[in-house]
Amino acid sequence: MIQEWYEVWVDESTKIPYVLFLCPDPSNPGGMLIIDPKENNRIIQKLPDYNTAMLWLTEDEYTRVDGRMEIE
């Protein structure tokens, strides 16, 4: 799966923060994927756009780690 960038989102409500990745969906222009690295990078959500993905993450009390990681 080739990506241009990804964001790191964390749930800090637990003793050890839980991490998810947010990245563009290469099979759906404008779409977003939420990936769980702890589950062997399994895609846990496919969402239609960035705003919907942000709402999904913030509803579950995830916060974005500052910055966006570029992939070369």
Language-model features: where?
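Negatively charged, low-complexity tracts enriched in Asp/Glu with abundant Ser/Thr
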Residues: 1-14
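Generic structural signal for short, flexible, solvent-exposed coil/loop and linker residues
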Residues: 11, 36, 51-54
